[in-house]
Amino acid sequence: MDLKQIEKLMIAMGRNGMKRFAIKREGLELELERDTREGNRQEPVFYDSRLFSGFSQERPIPTDPKKDTIKETTTENSETSTTTSSGDFISSPLVGTFYGSPAPDSPSFVKPGDIVSEDTIVCIVEAMKVMNEVKAGMSGRVLEVLITNGDPVQFGSKLFRIAKDAS
């Protein structure tokens, strides 16, 4: 199963309102799960695209397996390839280009060590010339920024690692 087929499955899940999908086939086990909490729906925000003219948009998609969000298990040898980092993750709600600041010469929305609430804007994901603000969706402390400014992101790509509040 390749990435295009998985993306098609994710799109079909969204269209049909599915929250979870699992398949076992030909030695492959795949599980997909959508975060459907009310606070995670993002409204598009429009920015003047001239603010982002300093960002490069011709960078390759990163293929670091530590940043993948899909859990794959081969049934033949029962090895699992998934991240085991502690903390929770803020993931991209859509496919687009990641921007960690409102403009190329502006400071980042958040940096490691910052405290965020559910409504804190942590980044922008640009899709089809629309700048979409991404909110944290949880309270906690930013442990790590996993994406670089201008990097393309896929739906579900991990953007930030967060230590959630105990409350």
Curated annotation (Swiss-Prot):
Keywords: Biotin, Fatty acid biosynthesis, Fatty acid metabolism, Lipid biosynthesis, Lipid metabolism. One of its GO terms (biological process) is fatty acid biosynthetic process. The keyword Cell inner membrane does not apply. The modification N6-biotinyllysine is found at residue 129. Residues 53-91 are annotated as: Disordered. Coiled coil: none annotated. Pathway: Lipid metabolism; fatty acid biosynthesis. InterPro entries: AcCoA_biotinCC, Biotin_BS, Biotin_Carboxyl_Carrier/Decarb, Biotin_lipoyl, Single_hybrid_motif. It comes from the Bacteria. The keyword Lipid biosynthesis applies. Residues 64-74 have a biased composition (Basic and acidic residues). Pfam families: Biotin_lipoyl. GO terms for cellular component: acetyl-CoA carboxylase complex. This protein is a component of the acetyl coenzyme A carboxylase complex; first, biotin carboxylase catalyzes the carboxylation of the carrier protein and then the transcarboxylase transfers the carboxyl group to form malonyl-CoA. This is Biotin carboxyl carrier protein of acetyl-CoA carboxylase. It comes from Chlamydia pneumoniae. The gene is accB.
